[in-house]
Amino acid sequence: MLNVLQKLKIPWNVSNIAQNAASAAICYHPFLEKSRNLIKNENQFLKKSISKIKNFSCYNSSTNFILLNTKIKSKTLQKKLLRKNILIRDCSTFRGLNENYVRIAVKKRKDNLKLIKALEAI
């Protein structure tokens, strides 16, 4: 009987406190609306800014991530940005992509400006 129950158990446990916090966050509409607006506005700002930078182009996204195509190898770009405390995702292992793709996160304006300045300097 115990073996059967263990097979049905989800691979991780979520505490009651975490469940309640998630429920409260989902129900807190002002926060969700503010977050959606921030992501939408900063996403547009990043795409517009990056499109002006040589060697970079970006794909449309309605999420808090943007896929970039770069003429710089993804691992090289990742290392250069890491030196400036900026994390990006190397997408060379993603199916259908190669070493010329990275993913950036849409963040607050201050962080996005830091990323743009770093990309311009490369």
Could you describe each region identified by the protein language model?
Residues 72, 83-84, 95-122:
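PLP-dependent enzyme catalytic core of the Aspartate aminotransferase-like
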